[in-house]
Curated annotation (Swiss-Prot):
GO cellular component: nucleus
Domain bZIP: 90-153
Record field: compositional bias (Basic and acidic residues): 84-94
Originating species: Trichophyton rubrum (strain ATCC MYA-4607 / CBS 118892)
Compartmental location: Nucleus
Official protein name in the record: Transcriptional regulator of the unfolded protein response hacA
Segments of skewed composition (Low complexity): 218-240
One annotated GO molecular function: DNA binding
Record-annotated membrane-spanning stretches: none
Annotated region (Basic motif), positions in chain: 92-101
Length: 384
C-alpha cells in the first residue's frame, strides 16, 4: 500500500515539472494594462480629489531699481566701527549702495566722454580719408597727363634730331618751355634757346657800354642804356657819376676806412696806395725848432761843467735818480707823451693816409744830451 502511494506521488511530481528542453511562453499583454488605478475605482458621480504637489522653491530676491529711494539709517555708526545690530548693518548696506551708485555714475560718464571723443576722431579721419582720396585721383589724372606730354615730347625730340630744320623742332622747344612752366612755374626758369640768346646779348652789351668823364671838376652825367629783348621788356638806366665817385667805386671797405677825408670830399690831397710819398728825414735844425718851441730861451747847459747840486732835492732823496751817469738812456713818461704829440703834429701837417711812427730814439734826446750832436757817441742819446 505504501509503495503504491509513493509511486503515484512520484509520477504526479514528474508530470508537473517542466521538461528541461521546453521554452518559456512570452507575455502578450502589458502589465500596466492589467493594473488597476485609483481613478478607475472612484465612481463618476463623486468629485475627484487633487493630489498634493511638491512645495515650490522660494523666488530669488530681485535687485532694486536705481530710482528707488533708500531709507534713512536709524543709527550713526562711525566708519571704522564694526556693525553688530540689525540697524547698524542696514546703515552699512545703505552706505554701500550709495557708494556703488556714485561709482557707477562716474563710470558711465567716463564711458560717455570716451565714446564722444572716439566718434569725433572717427568723423575727422573719415573726412581726411575722403580728401586724400580726391587728392589721389587728381594727382593720378595729372600724372597721366604729364606722362602723355612727356611721351609726346620725346617723340618730337626724336623727330627734331632726325630733321633739325623741320617745324617739329620748334614745336619741341615750345613744348619743353610749357612743361617746365607747368612743373615749376615759380622756381625754375623756362629752358628755351631764347634764354641763352638773351644771356649772350647781355654779355656783348656790357663791353659796349660807354663811360665818358669830362676834365671839368664839376659833376658830369654818364647815361648807360642797356636794352634786353627778354619777353619784349626794355630797361633804361641813367647813372650820375663824378670823378671822385669813379675813384672810389672800386675801393675796398678797408680803403674807405683809411681815407675818411676823401669820402666826404674834403680839401685834403688824396693819396692812393701806389702814390705814397714819404717826406725827407728831419734835420737837426728842425728837431731843435720843434723841441725848443715852448721855451723862451735856449737851455742852460752850465750844469754839464759845474755838476748837479744835490741840495736842490728835498731831504736829499736820491730814489728817483738811481743811475751811475748823468745820461738817462731809457724814455720816461714825459718823453713818450711828447713823442706822441710830435707824431700827431707831423701826421696833421704832412697828411699821411696811414700813421707810421718813427723810431723813438731819433726824435727825442735823453736827459743831458746835446741838441747839436757835438758830444761823443757814448754820451749823445740821439746817436744811432
Amino acid at each position: 500500500m505504501t509503495e503504491s502511494t509513493f509511486a503515484v506521488e512520484t509520477f504526479s511530481m514528474d508530470s508537473m515539472s517542466p521538461s528541461p528542453g521546453a521554452e518559456i511562453p512570452r507575455l502578450t499583454v502589458s502589465p500596466a494594462d492589467t493594473t488597476l488605478k485609483f481613478e478607475d475605482l472612484v465612481p463618476e458621480g463623486l468629485p475627484k480629489v487633487d493630489t498634493p504637489k511638491p512645495a515650490e522653491k522660494k523666488p530669488v530676491k530681485k535687485r532694486k531699481s536705481w530710482g528707488q529711494e533708500l531709507p534713512t539709517p536709524k543709527t550713526n555708526l562711525p566708519p571704522r566701527k564694526r556693525a553688530k545690530t540689525e540697524d547698524e548693518k542696514e546703515q552699512r548696506r545703505i552706505e554701500r549702495v550709495l557708494r556703488n551708485r556714485a561709482a557707477a555714475q562716474i563710470s558711465r560718464e567716463r564711458k560717455r566722454l570716451e565714446i564722444e571723443k572716439l566718434e569725433g576722431e572717427k568723423l575727422k579721419i573719415e573726412q581726411q580719408n575722403e580728401f586724400l582720396l580726391r587728392r589721389l585721383s587728381q594727382m593720378e589724372a595729372e600724372n597721366n597727363r604729364l606722362s602723355q606730354q612727356v611721351a609726346k615730347l620725346a617723340s618730337e625730340i626724336q623727330t627734331s634730331k632726325s630733321n633739325p630744320g623741320s617745324p617739329a623742332s620748334a614745336s619741341a622747344s615750345a613744348s619743353t618751355s610749357s612743361i617746365s612752366a607747368t612743373l615749376a612755374p615759380s622756381t625754375s626758369p623756362t629752358l628755351a634757346p631764347v634764354l641763352f640768346k638773351q644771356e649772350n646779348d647781355l654779355l656783348d652789351n656790357i663791353d659796349s657800354i660807354p663811360f665818358t668823364i669830362n676834365p671839368d671838376p664839376s659833376t658830369t652825367t654818364t647815361t648807360t642804356t642797356t636794352t634786353t629783348t627778354s619777353n619784349n621788356i626794355s630797361s633804361t638806366s641813367s647813372t650820375t657819376l663824378s670823378p671822385a665817385d669813379l675813384d672810389h667805386s672800386s675801393a675796398t671797405p678797408s680803403d674807405l676806412a683809411q681815407h675818411p677825408a676823401a669820402v666826404f670830399h674834403l680839401n685834403i690831397p688824396l693819396l692812393r696806395e701806389h702814390d705814397h710819398v714819404h717826406p725827407p728825414p728831419l734835420s737837426d735844425a728842425d728837431l731843435s725848432r720843434l723841441f725848443d718851441a715852448d721855451s723862451s730861451s735856449e737851455p742852460d747847459l752850465s750844469f754839464l761843467e759845474d755838476g748837479f747840486s744835490l741840495e736842490l732835492l728835498p731831504d736829499s732823496d736820491l730814489g728817483p735818480f738811481a743811475f751811475d751817469s748823468l745820461v738817462d738812456l731809457g724814455p720816461d713818461e714825459d718823453n713818450q707823451q711828447q713823442q706822441q704829440q710830435l707824431q700827431q703834429k707831423l701826421d696833421d701837417s704832412i697828411g699821411f693816409p696811414e700813421q707810421t711812427p718813427l723810431p723813438a730814439s731819433g726824435l727825442q734826446p735823453s736827459f743831458g744830451a746835446s741838441l747839436e750832436r757835438c758830444d761823443e757817441q757814448g754820451i749823445a742819446a740821439g746817436a744811432q
